[in-house]
Amino acid sequence: MRIRNFNEGLVLKTIEENSSISRADIGKIVGLTPPTISAIVKDLIERDIVQEIGKGDSSGGKKPTLLKINSKAAYMVAVDLGGENGIRVALMDLSYNIVKEKFDSKIESLNSQKLKNSLSVILKDFIKEINIPKEKILSICIGVPGIIDNKLKKVTVAPYLNWEISLEDLTLKEIGIPISLENDVNLMALGEKTKGIAQKINNFVFVGERTGIGAGIIINRKIYKGANNAAGEVGYLLIDPKYAPKSTRDNGCLEKLASYKVILEKAREKMGKNIRVIDVFKMAAEEDSVALGIVKETLKFLAYGIGNISCILDPELVIIGGGISILPKKFLEEIKMNIQEIIPFVPKIEFSKLGEDGVLIGAAVKVLEPLKKKGLILINSK
């Protein structure tokens, strides 16, 4: 059975790495005999893991039947705790598509214990609602704004939200689905690497303008986390000594100058208490003078942060994501002009096209990509 599973893994991995492929071409790549390939593929089709999708081209003779992975053969659940809309939960398929999602309460209003209780209830209810067999849900991945201690499976620093959370606190053991935590901006970087504008880029930085400000650093197509999992905590960059944090638990300087919270404070003072960050960005795009002033000031400080990052990493590309990415492209020129004030070389800069979906997509990538590379998805499902 082990040999069969190993061969199955080879076949699955090969189909996954090719958008469509014939049985004969699989055999050429993995070195298995045609009868072995046919038997494995027949079993995978019967288990609804692989699909036949039509005929391919032929250089002579019978046209081959093409195969692909069934993206609905298995799923994972992605959770985003770092956006303006509160807790966002989504069911993701094997192609990193959002199948179903729901929103819940704003997490800024929840203390640590209430967050744990709320998140546990939301996840349990969501898994009931989607009505999918548990064996088809490979994992749950929670994107959080903060530093993750992987050994303790715990968020240790999340100053803007003023809470800590550990997987053990979530009381989800009875669900029977593996759960992991990851920094939300790291997940956005993974999303860009796989389904965004960095699919062909080896080294890039994703700067997330969200509840706080963070950076996901991709080096040689892999997330760089640093010795203490704190790489990319650019919210602590010192942009102006007047805004230096008073303690290590305080919000960082760049976050005090350019985060969602700061934008909201300025906007609500000048534009009304009910305005949202996304509204400010939309109004700035429409040339509203008050919103434009707030956004331009934010972009200036964000640009200084990107300039500092570029001096250290010299990335091929810097992607700016979060709600701010809905701004028109002309605002990128504003950022570049501000960077030119402080450094002699300006990196290529783009706004993300994934928006807030990047966290959910990245969570799916984090869970599924390692499994796909090993060809292990659903090998033991019957």
Q: Which residue ranges define each predicted feature?
A:
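ATP-binding/phosphotransfer module of carbohydrate and carboxylate kinases, centering on a glycine-rich
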Residues: 1-61, 66-103, 108-136, 175, ...
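Phosphate-binding/catalytic loop of phosphoryl-transfer enzymes
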Residues: 79, 86, 138-249, 362, ...
